[in-house]
């Protein structure tokens, strides 16, 4: 496996057959930061492309020497996108986590003709602003550091973001409550992503910021806008479709942990399925035990949670029960974990936390 120099990135472009992950083409074209590994410098036939948005593996899936070296460049927790169906069965055999699990993603596209502007007014006390990196660096606004980190990872520099990207945010005096940023661009297509502080959701802030960002993307000359999200993210799907985005493809990625973008993206039964999967996988990969507990807690299953915690205790692995208690209390504020008020859980905590309330 060889780490390509930037001047050689375009040698792998014909290996990429899928069109879902725009960041892959942004990196190949030199517009966004990223790293590319290939099985040959002169004439590559297999490649691992790492971007700020994804890791994608493409080309010939049968180069066993290349495949054996892929795990050296991926962390246990890294997600991995197969470029073709031929890679689907290969990924669990070449990833550090042999139990990595596939999940479904959505690819939406918007053209100017289909755009539906969102014109509802902002609530009193909130303002809409174009993202200004210099202003954010000098401000003390809550969430500004998160935005700056994302922009740095995606674009590398303020100058490149100004040239190719855009974004809008909604804020009050002290807090940025929602923001939509362009993640990457390639030729006449740009991809955008949305985030709203969980304390301020269901207020229309995301739609307002997204609508403004879309208009600015078209004003900059882009012809199409990409919107990618997990298949379970109902909120993101609703906003995209309200603005006129059209679903053009469903595709798969692989993950070591539940692929959620919001706490309630998965139902209790879906969380339970993840708990079962992680419980079985943890017999080989012990580091998945904590993820297993988190999944069973979110599935609202007290008995399974206690059983797993008891098994961990018997292995002489320490757990911070007070942290779990406080985390569950926080989840209950989102109408989750209602069963964790039952006597069985309270008694279990009493046994493991001195003087627990």
Identify the meaning behind each predicted range.
Residues 33-34, 38-138, 254, 315:
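Acyl-donor-binding surface of acyltransferase catalytic domains
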Residues 153-198:
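A conserved beta-strand-loop-helix scaffold within acyl/acetyltransferase catalytic domains
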Residues 63-69, 192, 202-217, 238, ...:
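Conserved acetyl-CoA-binding loop-helix of GNAT-fold acetyltransferases
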Residues 268, 301-304, 329-356:
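Alpha-helical linker/edge segments of TPR/alpha-solenoid repeat scaffolds
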Residues 1-21, 115-155, 266-283:
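Short amphipathic alpha-helix that is part of the acyltransferase structural core
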Residues 101-111, 244-261, 320:
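Conserved catalytic-core motifs of GNAT/GCN5-like acyltransferases
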Residues 75-85, 217-229:
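Conserved GNAT acetyl-CoA-binding A-motif
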Residues 87-98, 207, 231-249:
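Conserved active-site alpha-helix within GNAT-family acetyltransferase domains
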